[in-house]
């Protein structure tokens, strides 16, 4: 009996020690280098924000970098966090169940530069300026150093107008995948205070329009993502940031055409991505003319894009800046040899289309050297004529060169007629009407004369 009792006591002690060991292992500590420290608290079923950090954080240098992750836990409320040494602190609460954040939550970490609150259940009412208040000194709340804020994949409809009052250094804001629907007045006021913003992600926010002056205060904006929304045209409001905007992503919108009004004012745009737009059928004349600094164009995965005007790059060919053009996975069959100076490209993508291998394509691929711009293993194939179906377009030869097929051109569209043709048509119709009137007048006069003579 004595031995059994002793055995039970030993077992209890061992269990307590094991549990204590696990309790101390809630977060793992790693030191990538002498100036960096990572506190990994991810996937531990953590339900509450800890009151303090592991002791190892006390030894980080003042100019060190600290990363703290709570990815994929069960935290519902973000309470006030303990202070963390280091000149740059990043914290991730991604993929929790957060529904509330207390005031002064990050007050003890004024060097917080990166905060990820994505994939939670945060509403717009939860996001208040008070949660980003810095240290309280001389009766005034200071600011925190926040540069990147990710609040994507939440339940945000609107932003508090003072939300960014204490984050003057904010340069990257991710609002994607929230049910915003309308950029209301208070949301626009909030954005207007983030004057140092360089990156703005509004993808999949269910918006269909942007007020004209929405971005007029964002004089440093360089990158914006408007994908996955309900835009029928490219928002004209982008012209307000045309001098600074360098990257525009405009995928998955119900736009039917691109034209000379689509990119007005975007003179400094470097990279443009327009893809996965199922309704896009046509790229019209002078569409890309305003893009005088464009280097990379992604015009891909538009299932119904059949036509690109030979003047789509009108005015740019003499001062050509484009280095990479991707036209993959559209519904194109033909391109004009004059569309662009193909030999000036560094990379060209054309795969996944239904190419008619004719004289125009021969000129583009072989004579102008476009065939040397394809990435290895990404060479496009011929779809027609039947004789060349399945062949690489680089195998097109002069021995088989069918007539250029212009069935893609809409010949009945009024815009296709030249002014002189319209003028001659009007004159012709007018002459027919005049002749008809003269004949009618002659017949009536003859009838009156004949009737008068018959009565006499």
Region roles according to the model:
Residues 2-456:
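Extracellular leucine-rich repeat
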């Amino acid at each position: 009996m004595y031995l059994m009792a002793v055995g039970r006591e030993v077992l209890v002690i061992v269990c307590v020690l094991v549990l204590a060991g696990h309790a101390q292992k809630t977060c793992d500590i790693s030191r990538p280098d002498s100036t960096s420290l990572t506190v990994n608290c991810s996937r531990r079923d953590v339900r509450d924000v800890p009151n303090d950090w592991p002791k190892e954080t006390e030894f980080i240098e003042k100019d060190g970098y600290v990363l703290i992750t709570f990815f994929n836990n069960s935290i519902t409320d973000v309470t006030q966090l303990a202070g963390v040494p280091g000149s740059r602190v990043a914290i991730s609460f991604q993929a929790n169940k957060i529904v509330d954040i207390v005031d002064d939550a990050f007050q003890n970490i004024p060097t917080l530069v990166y905060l990820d609150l994505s994939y939670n259940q945060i509403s717009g009412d939860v996001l208040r300026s008070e949660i980003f208040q810095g240290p309280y000194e001389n009766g005034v709340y200071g600011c925190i150093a926040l540069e990147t804020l990710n609040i994507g994949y939440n339940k945000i409809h609107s932003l508090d107008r003072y939300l960014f009052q204490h984050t003057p250094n904010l340069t990257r804001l991710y609002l994607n995948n929230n049910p915003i629907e309308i950029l209301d007045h208070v949301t626009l006021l909030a954005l207007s205070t983030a004057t140092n913003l360089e990156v703005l992600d509004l993808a999949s926010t269910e918006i269909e329009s942007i007020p004209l002056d929405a971005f007029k205060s964002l004089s440093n904006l360089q990158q914006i993502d408007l994908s996955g929304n309900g835009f029928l045209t490219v928002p004209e409001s982008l012209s307000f940031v045309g001098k600074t905007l360098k990257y525009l992503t405009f995928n998955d919108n119900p736009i039917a055409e691109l034209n000379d009004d689509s990119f007005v004012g975007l003179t400094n745009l470097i990279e443009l991505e327009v893809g996965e737009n199922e309704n896009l059928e046509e790229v019209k004349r002078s569409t890309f003319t305003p893009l005088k600094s464009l280097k990379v164009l992604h015009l891909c995965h538009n299932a119904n894009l059949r036509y690109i005007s030979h003047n789509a790059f009108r005015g740019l060919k003499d001062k050509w800046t484009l280095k990479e053009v991707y036209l993959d996975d559209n519904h194109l069959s033909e391109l004009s040899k004059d569309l662009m100076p193909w030999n000036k490209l560094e990379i060209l993508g054309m795969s996944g289309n239904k190419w008619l291998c004719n004289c125009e394509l021969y000129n583009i691929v072989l004579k102008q050297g476009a065939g040397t711009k394809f990435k290895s293993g990404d060479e496009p194939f011929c779809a027609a004529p039947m004789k060349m179906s399945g062949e690489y377009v680089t195998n097109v030869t002069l021995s088989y060169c069918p007539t250029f097929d212009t069935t893609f051109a809409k010949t009945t569209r009024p815009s296709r007629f030249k002014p002189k043709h319209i003028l001659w048509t009007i004159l012709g119709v007018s002459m027919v009407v005049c002749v008809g009137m003269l004949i009618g007048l002659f017949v009536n006069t003859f009838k009156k004369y004949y009737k008068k003579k018959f009565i006499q």
